[in-house]
């Protein structure tokens, strides 16, 4: 189906290569057609998929970037886990139901010894409402817990008096210097006193 005979992965890689050397401002100004596909002829020669969403995500990532401890030569890893958080997705004549998926995202860097040098963790809870009449409603946008910041509303319920993003930051700081094997052995019952002093949310 591709006019340039390339698969999605190849085109996504081509777009990533095209961005190398650009500033965040230049990325944000990349022009696209109404369908999100690029206008630039050079980019079109290797990428014809819609790139507007990826463009905006890259620009946003640049705007949110901060120094967390990574160094030149570190390896970057991304982990994503999705779990069904819906108890029942059968709507009845008198009851609407919500279908929710909990998506956990962790990005980290590790040095040549495999020890974490920086990490950031986030979570999103996108949900659909299945109406009793069979229609399905979805929010226009879903904000992650980090994006919600203080408005997430966890501080009052936290034994540490912390908001969710602060718990996440505490957990990520705790990971620094640890290997994957050491992290995998972390107790899930909150019995690690050092971690419990920083973070009491579920980190499993």
Residues covered by each model-derived region:
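Active-site- and interface-proximal helix/loop "cap" or "latch" segments in soluble metabolic
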Residues: 1-204
